[in-house]
């Protein structure tokens, strides 16, 4: 069971809504992966009516909506988008995204921290997308963010946990949930994140662009479950030396 702010989730796999060939395929994949929290970009939905092709099936499915501020380049733009989302969707949950460079889509640490502090003061449950910077993640936690969402690699790159060393530090020092976001390309990446101690992962591109998104969604669900179970089972420690699993000489001594 995963708890973030005032909500609990059975699934440790969060998903997005971008890049799917159709809203029907999107919903089939979401159901297949068992995600209970789904992020959506405010610029992609019709906020004036809930019969939007993306929004309507999500509301009907009863998943927790996590609107994001993707496209915002400054703290001011992100705060403006956050208020639009709260008014239109009736939720104070927000994935804070501020990335000024459209080529790399890397989060702006200064603007993110500035916006996060103000949004928390304004009553939002803030989950910030951020770089894998242990100092920044601790500062975001200190200003009241409900979780932190450090990247594994650039958005949509499918490179995996390129920031593993920093993620391990973030996880070790965090007192709020850590959700690894961005760059997860295959189910084994998700399993590794849960094994190392992450509370959840957010996966979008890897599922949406797969040849078979629904089966890929199932694969991610199983990988996340496996990674979490492995961590809870207490993996053995790593060693530079070999350790025999069976006696090497006992049978010789017994035959003498």
Curated annotation (Swiss-Prot):
Keywords: Cytoplasm, Schiff base, Thiamine biosynthesis, Transferase
Active-site positions on this chain: 95
Stored InterPro entries: Aldolase_TIM, Thiazole_synthase_ThiG, ThiG
PANTHER family: THIAZOLE SYNTHASE
Residues that, per the record, bind 1-deoxy-D-xylulose 5-phosphate: 156, 182-183, 204-205
Function in brief: Catalyzes the rearrangement of 1-deoxy-D-xylulose 5-phosphate (DXP) to produce the thiazole phosphate moiety of thiamine. Sulfur is provided by the thiocarboxylate moiety of the carrier protein ThiS. In vitro, sulfur can be provided by H(2)S.
Catalytic activities: [ThiS sulfur-carrier protein]-C-terminal-Gly-aminoethanethioate + 2-iminoacetate + 1-deoxy-D-xylulose 5-phosphate = [ThiS sulfur-carrier protein]-C-terminal Gly-Gly + 2-[(2R,5Z)-2-carboxy-4-methylthiazol-5(2H)-ylidene]ethyl phosphate + 2 H2O + H(+)
Pfam families named among the record's database cross-references: ThiG (PF05690)
Protein name, UniProt field: Thiazole synthase
Chief site of localization: cytoplasm
Membrane listed as a keyword: no
E.C. code: 2.8.1.10
GO CC aspect terms: cytoplasm
GO biological process: thiamine diphosphate biosynthetic process
Subcellular locations according to the entry: Cytoplasm
GO molecular function, one term: thiazole synthase activity
Gene3D superfamilies to which the protein is assigned, alphabetical: Aldolase class I
Pathway: Cofactor biosynthesis; thiamine diphosphate biosynthesis
Subunit structure comment from the entry: Homotetramer. Forms heterodimers with either ThiH or ThiS.
């Amino acid at each position: 069971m995963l708890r973030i702010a005032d909500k609990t989730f059975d699934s440790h796999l969060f998903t997005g809504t971008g890049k799917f060939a159709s809203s029907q395929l999107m919903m089939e994949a979401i159901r297949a992966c068992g995600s209970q929290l789904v992020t959506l970009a405010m610029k992609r939905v019709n906020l004036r009516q809930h019969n939007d092709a993306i929004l309507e099936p999500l509301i009907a499915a009863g998943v927790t909506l996590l609107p994001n501020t993707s496209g915002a380049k400054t703290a001011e733009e992100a705060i403006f988008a956050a208020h639009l989302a709260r008014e239109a969707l009736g939720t104070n949950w927000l994935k804070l995204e501020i990335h000024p460079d459209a080529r790399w889509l890397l989060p702006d640490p200064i603007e993110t921290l500035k916006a996060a502090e103000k949004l928390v003061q304004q009553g939002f449950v803030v989950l910030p997308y951020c770089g894998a910077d242990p100092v920044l993640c601790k500062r975001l936690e200190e200003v009241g963010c409900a979780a932190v969402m450090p990247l594994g690699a650039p958005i949509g790159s499918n490179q995996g946990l390129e920031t593993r060393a920093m993620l391990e530090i973030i996880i070790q020092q965090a007192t709020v949930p850590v959700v690894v976001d961005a760059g997860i390309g295959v189910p084994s990446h998700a399993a590794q994140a849960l094994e190392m101690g992450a509370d959840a992962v957010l996966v979008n591109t890897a599922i949406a662009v797969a040849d078979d998104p629904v089966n890929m969604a199932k694969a991610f669900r199983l990988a996340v479950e496996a990674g979490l179970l492995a961590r809870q089972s207490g993996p053995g420690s790593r060693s530079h030396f070999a350790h025999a699993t069976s006696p090497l000489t006992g049978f010789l001594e017994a035959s003498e």
